[in-house]
Regions:
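N-terminal alpha/beta PP-like core and its mobile active-site loop of ThDP/TPP-dependent enzymes
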Residues: 2-150
């Protein structure tokens, strides 16, 4: 029987300290690449809180499909990748159309999507969908960050 690996605490993850989350690491990575703003709502929570603290402006959308098109427009107008964030499940599904448009038009849009806990994946958890499968047809590259050290 496979037992899941223990989830590391921030103190055991390289590059994070006790006061930081994976959201902080993502914000630092985006800042290194010149990202100044993202389009999102309140989720993924730790990313949104970290973005504000890290100086990444958050532009709020009403629905995820609108957020995807906002990120697309931003990329077209600035020449920089547009970043959109979304909650998992049905909310994430609303990103399919704008991501398909961006892919076919060769517009750089990055979607950061919350997911259920690793321990709840494939167990019919609330709003658990196969995001990898859903986004593979409308994205150049899709990955899941399974542990903070990634």
């Amino acid at each position: 029987m496979n037992t899941p690996k223990p989830i590391p605490t921030p103190l055991t993850v390289t590059g994070l300290n006790v006061h930081e989350s994976v959201g902080h690491a993502i914000v630092r990575a985006l800042k290194r690449h010149g990202v100044e703003c993202t389009f999102g709502q309140s989720l993924p929570t730790m990313f949104q809180l970290s973005a504000e603290a890290g100086g990444v402006k958050q532009i709020v959308y009403r629905t995820e499909n609108a957020g995807g098109y906002m990120a697309d427009a931003y990329a077209r107008l600035t020449g920089k990748p547009g970043i959109v964030t979304a909650q998992n499940g049905p909310a994430a599904a609303l990103l399919v159309a704008p991501l398909a448009e961006a892919l076919k038009a060769s517009i750089p849009v990055i979607a950061l999507v919350q997911d259920v806990s690793r321990l709840q994946t494939d167990k019919n958890a609330f709003q658990d969908l196969d995001h990898i499968g859903m986004f593979s047809a409308v994205s150049k590259w899709v990955r899941r960050v399974n542990e903070p050290s990634r």
